[in-house]
Amino acid sequence: MWNGKKKAVTFSIDDGVVQDRRAVALLNKYGLKGTFNLNSNYLGQGGLTTWLKKVVSHSKVEASEVKDLYKGHEVAVHTLTHPHLEEIEDEAEIVRQVEEDRKKLSELCGYEVVGMAYPYGTYNDKVVKCILEKTGVKYSRTVKSTYDFTPQKEDLLRFHPTVYYVEKCLEEVVDKFLATETDEPQLLYIWGHTYELDAELITWEAFERVCQKLANRDDIFYGTNKEVLL
């Protein structure tokens, strides 16, 4: 349990794009917490991306704002440059991508970064072994939705989230979580990218509606990924 509470909610948001500013404001408004997974080599860079034929900003937040922007939340590793780690043959390069990102982000934030999300959600046994043996990362998130609320207590370098927030079943999953009554611990872990909200894969209004539903519940612990997993 979490501080005596049987339920916990956490968010995980990738890439460190400027739309995170709006998402952080919403999470703060409703007393929710999240973990933001950043590529330190890309901080401050501009860019665009296309989703559902809609061009949206993929510009990254500035390094100078990371500490204050994500205050009260958690910053975590997303590697230096967002490669497919499982395609890298050189183990030293896998370690460099992860550990140098972790160290740079730790310096920016003023605390030791210990979490991670895999770029593209992809990995293999070699990647996991490198991270386990040669980095300071304690957990790493995949992109495989479980739609289940049973907390994963083992193999945290292959941690699977509950639901991706662009999935049509998001609100159904949230409602099911809220309605579940059990003596067993229950974790709702929601992940995504905030530029997807601009692309309206899920609207900002729908995202806020989910935040409203989850907020101000006496039986729920609101924490970062680190706080609910470690």
Positions of predicted regions on the chain:
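Boundary/entry segment of secreted carbohydrate-active catalytic domains
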Residues: 1-19
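C-terminal domain-boundary segment and adjacent tail
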Residues: 1-2, 29-31, 40, 106-107, ...
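Active-site metal-binding loops of divalent metal-dependent hydrolases
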Residues: 13-16, 79, 194, 225
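Hydrophobic "anchor" residues on beta-strands that sit immediately upstream
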Residues: 10-11, 74, 220
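A short acidic, amphipathic alpha-helical/loop segment
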Residues: 22-26, 126-131, 210
